[in-house]
Amino acid sequence: LTGHLDDRQIAEFARHQPIVVTGRRLDAPQVRALALDQEAGGYLATRHLLSLGHRRIAHIAGPADHTDATERRAGYERALREAGLPLARELVVQSDFMESGGLLAMNRLLDSGQSFTAVFAANDQSAFGARMAMYRRGVRVPDDVSIVGVDDLPGAAYATPPMTTVRQPIYESALAAAHALVT
């Protein structure tokens, strides 16, 4: 799991030790990269909201320099295009992948005065923060605004009400990474 190391740093480390990275695409000697289809996660989350009848779907985006975030946003935009809906840039708020960032992003959306009936958060942690912001403002989930995250963190099932999330095969990815290390 690479965190915020850039590709150059990973390739340099791999010169001394074969490594496996998950969650990114990287072509370098002695590096095995295992990537998930993040675009599909954003697409599925947005399609779900569209299937519920939502047409004004906000997006709490992840960091602009993070591949997972940009790919999930691309999936959000593709789902809107396929539904014949314009991308409402005023409904896209940049954030990080943290609860506090989701809370701040939702506050910006609510303060903007823009109407929306649903939110696609780039990950579950951002969605948790967004839910807290809505709760503090008296906005009821899902009665007033629906929200979908990505990752299927264990806490999603224990939120009130349980949060809809797109499952990422994290366990399976970790098994594949471990297997790649020993083969």
Describe each model-derived feature in a short phrase.
Residues L34-H59, A74, E99-R108, A127, ...:
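Hydrophobic alpha-helical segments within soluble ligand-binding/sensing domains
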Residues R55-R56, L87-L91, V141-S146:
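Short acidic capping loops at alpha-helix termini that bridge into adjacent secondary structure
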Residues N107-R108, S112-T183:
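Flexible loop/turn connectors
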Residues T2-L44, Q125, D151-M163:
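Flexible loop/hinge segments that line or gate small-molecule binding clefts
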Residues H59-R78, F128:
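Secondary-structure junction motif
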